[in-house]
């Protein structure tokens, strides 16, 4: 089985590490292993996508600066044909409306709960419909 291609975006290396640790080498036992692609800047992420990369899931930090993951999520959904599912990480539960605006399929809040993140990611990789947390 081919590895699941997962993009992780955050300007904060500790946030990227938390996300990657939560995902582990395989998000769930019924899914293939992960291949993680880390990005600290929106321009690097867009160059990767524009280069024709096949991606199964985007996990984007909405608290990144100067370019937040919510805006990038919206741009991906607007510009990428058959865009992969997007999971955004917001600063607080009350920001769920921003996650909805971004057209992300799912959202979780900081601080990252590894179990919630892994479950949401697994559901999206399986093609399940997920709502904001």
Model-predicted segments: where are they?
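Conserved acidic segment of CheY-like receiver
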Residues: 3-24, 58
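C-terminal output helix
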Residues: 18, 112-121
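Short hydrophobic/Thr-rich beta-strand motif most characteristic of the beta2 strand and flanking loop
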Residues: 27-40
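Acidic, metal-coordinating helix/loop segments flanking the phosphotransfer/catalytic sites
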Residues: 38-57
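Conserved phosphotransfer cores of two-component systems
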Residues: 50-53, 77-82
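Two-component signal transduction core modules
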Residues: 58, 107-108
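Alpha4 helix (beta4-alpha4-beta5 surface) of REC/receiver domains from two-component response regulators
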Residues: 91-107
